[in-house]
UniProtKB/Swiss-Prot annotation:
A Pfam family of this chain: FH2
Protein name (Swiss-Prot/TrEMBL): Formin-like protein 13
SMART domains membership: FH2
Protein's organism: Oryza sativa subsp. japonica (Rice)
PANTHER family registered for this protein in UniProt: FORMIN-LIKE PROTEIN 13, FORMIN-RELATED
Chief site of localization: membrane
GO cellular component: cytoskeleton; membrane
Family named by the database record: Belongs to the formin-like family. Class-I subfamily.
A Gene Ontology biological process term: actin nucleation
GO terms, molecular function: actin filament binding
Keywords: Membrane, Signal, Transmembrane, Transmembrane helix
Locations listed in the record: Membrane
Biased composition (Pro residues): 51-67, 194-216, 262-286
Length: 774
C-alpha cells in the first residue's frame, strides 16, 4: 500500500514539473517573438532544423536591440495573455497533484479500515473460543474453586460465557490483556492427595467409628448458580493445565489463587468430633506393619491417631508381658575365657569315641569353680555391674601420670630387664658400666621420659601405691641427679671399647689385605697366564700385545665359552697352570706315566685351591665399607660430648659427695677416649693410603676411575669364588692327553700354549665387550 501511494505522488510531481517547464517555454516565446508555442509531445528543437551558413567577414553583425526597445515593439494585449496562460497552467498542475494525493489518502484509509475489521474478527473468534473452553472446564474446576477461583455472580450463566457480542468481547479482551490476572502463574509443587499428612486423631476409646467414605462437598468462594449448588465434585490439587485460566466476561470471572501450605497437625484434643471427616488414610508402610499390633485393629482414622500418640505399642507390650509374667527369664550366665578349638561335625552311620563320651554321666562340671577361676573380666558378667568388680574385685583405682601407650611400653621394657630400682640407682651413683652391661643401659635409655613427663613424675607427692609400678620405677630413678644423662654417658662408656676394637681390627685387615695382594706369587702367576692367553686370542687386532689389564677382566674369563661349549677360558688357564707347575722345564722329554700325571694334577689343584686361603684378608676386606668406618669414628667423637656434658653438670649437683666416684671415673674415661679416637683417625689415614697404593700397583693411573677405594678387594673376592668352582670342575674331569703325530708329548714350562692339541683345539673369538687391554 505504501508503495502505491509513493508511486502516485511521484507521478503527480512529474506531471507538475512538465507543466511548469512548458509554462516557462511559453513565456519565453511570447517575450522574444521568435520561439513558437509547442505541444507537450513536440521536442524542444525541430528535426528539420539546420544551422545557418557562416557569415562573411565583411558583413557586420548588428548589435541586439535593447530590452526596452523590444518590449516597446510588442503590444500591451499580448503580455496580458501570456500572464493568464501561465496562471492557468500552474493552477491545472496543482489541481492534478491534489487529486492524486487525495486518491492516495483514500486508498490508505481504506486499507487501514480493512485491517482493523480483520483484527476485530480474529479477536472475537479467540474470545468465543476461550469462553467455550472456560464453560467446558467449569464442571471439573468448580470442586476446587474454594481454594483457587471465585465463582461468577448469580446473574451470570454458562450461556453468557459462551455467546458473546464480538465488539464487547474485543473491548474486554483488550482490557484484560494488561490485567495481572492473565499473567502466567508459577507452578507450585504440591504433593498428591494420597500423600498429604493426616489430621490428628483421637484415642480409640473416645473416637467414634468413622463414617463411610464419601466425597467431600463442594466449597466455593463468592456466588454459584443453582446447577452448581446441586452438584458435588472432588478435584485434585492444582496442576499445570488447570492453574491458568482467563476471564471472558465482566459478569463471570474466576480468580486464580494458590493453595496455601497445610499447617502441622495439632495435638490431640478431647473436643467432640467435627461433622466433616477426612478421607481414609493410605495403608501403613512396611515398617509400620512390622511393629506389634493389637489383636483387634481399630479403624483407619483411629489407627493413625494411635500411631502419632504411641499408644498402640504400649498395650501390646503390656499384653505380652501379661502372657509371660508367669515364667521369669533365667539369669544370663557369666562369660568365661574362650577355649579356641576345632569343632568336628557329626558323622552319621559311623561309631566314634565321642558317642561314648556323649552318653557318659561320670563327669560333672563344677560351674562355680570355673566361674571363680576362668571368669572373663572383659566380658562383663551378669552380676558384675560395679566397675571395680569387673576389674577383678579390687576397689582400688590407680592414677595415671603417663600416656597409657607410653606406660605400656615402659612396663614391657622394665619386665625384660628384671631389675629393681635400687640396683639401677647404685650403678648410676658408682659409675661402673660393668655392673649391669651395655644392653641394660641401652634399654634404660629408651625409657627416658620427656621433659613434661619428668615434671609430672617429680611433682607427684601422693601415695606411691596408687600409681603404676612402671611410673614408680621412673620416679625412683629420677631421684638421682640428671639420672638419664648419666645413663647416656654410661651407655657410651660401655660400648666404647667394642667400637674401638672393631675399628682397629678393620683397619688392620685392610693393611694385611694390601700386603697379601701385592706379595702373592701364585696370584702373580695367574695374572701372567691370563695376560699371555689374552694376547694370543687377540693376536692381529688392536687389543693384542697388551702389557697390563684391569682386574675386572678376571670376572669375564668364565663367560668365554669354547667352540663345543664344554669348557671356558678360565678352565683352560687353570689346566695350563697345573701343567706348568707339575712339569719341570729342565727335565728330559720323557713321557711320564699316568700315575705321575694324576699326582701332578692333584698338586696343581691343591696349589690353586690354596690361593683363597692365601688371600684370606682380601676376602675379609671385601666385606668392609670405608664410609661406615669413617662414620663410626665421627659418631664416637660426637657422642663423647655427652660425657663432657655430664662433667659440666657436676657444678649443679646438690649432693656431690655421693656422686664423687661417678665423676672421677668419667674424667679418667674421657682422657682415654680422646686418645683412642685420635689413634683411630691415624689408623684410618694409614689404611686409606695403603689401599690407594695397592690399587695404583695393579691399575696404574686408572685409580681415579674407581667408584670407591675398596673395589679392588671386591673384584678379587668374586674371582676367588669363581676360581674355586672351576678347580672343583677340573678335579672331577678326567685328564685329557695331549696328542701330537700319534704320540703324547710334553710342553715346556715357558710356553703358554701348546703348538698342537687335537682334542682341545678351539677357535677362540672375543669382542671389545668381552675382553679389554691396556
Amino acid at each position: 500500500m505504501r508503495r502505491r501511494v509513493a508511486l502516485s505522488t511521484a507521478i503527480a510531481l512529474l506531471v507538475g514539473a512538465q507543466l511548469c517547464v512548458a509554462a516557462e517555454v511559453e513565456v519565453a516565446g511570447a517575450g522574444g517573438g521568435v520561439v513558437r508555442r509547442r505541444s507537450l509531445h513536440q521536442p524542444f528543437f525541430p528535426i528539420e532544423w539546420s544551422p545557418p551558413p557562416p557569415m562573411s567577414g565583411s558583413e557586420a553583425v548588428p548589435p541586439p536591440p535593447p530590452a526596452a526597445a523590444a518590449s516597446a515593439t510588442t503590444g500591451g494585449g499580448r503580455s496580458t495573455t501570456t500572464v493568464m496562460n501561465t496562471v492557468a497552467i500552474a493552477l491545472s498542475a496543482g489541481l492534478v497533484a491534489l487529486a492524486v494525493a487525495s486518491y492516495s489518502c483514500c486508498l490508505l484509509l481504506r486499507r487501514r479500515r480493512r485491517e482493523e475489521e480483520d483484527d476485530g474478527d480474529r479477536a472475537a473468534k479467540r474470545a468465543v473460543g476461550a469462553a467455550a473452553a472456560v464453560a467446558a472446564r467449569v464442571p471439573s474446576d468448580v470442586g476446587s474453586s474454594s481454594r483457587q477461583h471465585r465463582s461468577p455472580p448469580p446473574s451470570s450463566t454458562a450461556s453468557d460465557a459462551i455467546y458473546l457480542d464480538p465488539l464487547t468481547t474485543l473491548v474486554e479482551v483488550r482490557q484484560h490483556e494488561k490485567s495481572p490476572d492473565l499473567r502466567p502463574l508459577p507452578l507450585l509443587k504440591q504433593p498428591s492427595p494420597d500423600l498429604r499428612p493426616l489430621p490428628p486423631l483421637k484415642r480409640p476409646e473416645s473416637q467414634p467409628p468413622p463414617p463411610p467414605p464419601s466425597t467431600p462437598p463442594l466449597t466455593t468462594t463468592g456466588y454459584s448458580t443453582d446447577e452448581e449448588d446441586q452438584a458435588t465434585y472432588y478435584t485434585a490439587p492444582k496442576t499445570a493445565m488447570s492453574s491458568f485460566s482467563r476471564s471472558t466476561s465482566q459478569h463471570s470471572t474466576l480468580e486464580q489463587t494458590a493453595m496455601p501450605p497445610m499447617a502441622a497437625p495439632a495435638p490431640p484434643q478431647t473436643n467432640p468430633p467435627r461433622p466433616v471427616r477426612p478421607p481414609p488414610p493410605p495403608p501403613p508402610p512396611r515398617q509400620r506393619l512390622l511393629r506389634p499390633l493389637p489383636a483387634e485393629s481399630p479403624p483407619p482414622a483411629a489407627l493413625a491417631n494411635l500411631e502419632l500418640t504411641g499408644s498402640p505399642v504400649k498395650p501390646a507390650v503390656e499384653d505380652r508381658g501379661g502372657e509371660n509374667s508367669g515364667a521369669a527369664r533365667p539369669p544370663k550366665p557369666p562369660h568365661l575365657k574362650p577355649l579356641h578349638w576345632d569343632k568336628l561335625r557329626a558323622i552319621s552311620g559311623r561309631t566314634t569315641v565321642w558317642d561314648q563320651v556323649k552318653n557318659s554321666d561320670t563327669f560333672r562340671v563344677d560351674e562355680e569353680a570355673m566361674e571363680s577361676l576362668f571368669l572373663n573380666s572383659g566380658g562383663g558378667g551378669a552380676g558384675s555391674s560395679d566397675p571395680a568388680a569387673r576389674r577383678g574385685g579390687s576397689g582400688k583405682q590407680e592414677r595415671r601420670l603417663l600416656d597409657p601407650k607410653r606406660l605400656q611400653n615402659v612396663a614391657i621394657m622394665l619386665k625384660s630387664l628384671n631389675v629393681a630400682a635400687d640396683e639401677v640407682i647404685g650403678a648410676l651413683v658408682r659409675g661402673n658400666p660393668e655392673d649391669l652391661g651395655s644392653e641394660f643401659y641401652e634399654t634404660l635409655a629408651k625409657m627416658a621420659p620427656t621433659k613434661e613427663e619428668e615434671l609430672k613424675l617429680k611433682g607427684y607427692s601422693g601415695d606411691l601405691s596408687k600409681i603404676d609400678p612402671a611410673e614408680r620405677f621412673l620416679k625412683d630413678v629420677l631421684g638421682v641427679p640428671f639420672a638419664f644423662e648419666r645413663v647416656d654417658a654410661m651407655l657410651y662408656r660401655a660400648n666404647f671399647d667394642n667400637e674401638v676394637n672393631y675399628l682397629r681390627k678393620s683397619f688392620g685387615t685392610l693393611e694385611a689385605a694390601c700386603e697379601e695382594l701385592r706379595s702373592s706369587k701364585l696370584f702373580l702367576k695367574l695374572l701372567d697366564a691370563v695376560l699371555k692367553t689374552g694376547n694370543r686370542m687377540n693376536d692381529g687386532t688392536n687389543r693384542g700385545e697388551a702389557r697390563a689389564f684391569k682386574l675386572d677382566t678376571l670376572l669375564k674369563l668364565a663367560d668365554i665359552k669354547s667352540t663345543d661349549g664344554r669348557t671356558t677360558l678360565l678352565h683352560f688357564v687353570v689346566k695350563e697352570i697345573i701343567r706348568s707347575e707339575g712339569f719341570d722345564s729342565d727335565q728330559s722329554a720323557v713321557n711320564p706315566g699316568s700315575g705321575s700325571k694324576e699326582q701332578f694334577k692333584r698338586d696343581g689343584l691343591k696349589l690353586l685351591a690354596g690361593l683363597s686361603s692365601e688371600l684370606s684378608n682380601v676376602k675379609r676386606a671385601a666385606t668392609l665399607e670405608m664410609d661406615t668406618l669413617s662414620g663410626n669414628i665421627l659418631r664416637l667423637e660426637a657422642d663423647l660430648e655427652k660425657v663432657k656434658l655430664v662433667l659440666q653438670l657436676k657444678e649443679t649437683c646438690s649432693d656431690q659427695g655421693a656422686s664423687e666416684n661417678f665423676f672421677q671415673a668419667m674424667v679418667v674415661f674421657l682422657r682415654r677416649a680422646e686418645a683412642e679416637i685420635k689413634n683411630m683417625k691415624t689408623a684410618e689415614e694409614n689404611a686409606l693410603r695403603l689401599v690407594k697404593e695397592t690399587t695404583e700397583y695393579f691399575h696404574g693411573d686408572a685409580t681415579k676411575e674407581e667408584p670407591h677405594p675398596l673395589r679392588i678387594f671386591v673384584v678379587v673376592d668374586e674371582f676367588l669364588l669363581i676360581l674355586d668352582r672351576v678347580c672343583r670342575d677340573v678335579g672331577r674331569t678326567p685328564e685329557r692327553v695331549m696328542m701330537g703325530s700319534g704320540k703324547s708329548f710334553r710342553v715346556p714350562a715357558g710356553t703358554s700354549l701348546p703348538p698342537h692339541r687335537n682334542e682341545n683345539r678351539r677357535v677362540l673369538s672375543s669382542s671389545d665387550e668381552d675382553s679389554s687391554s691396556s
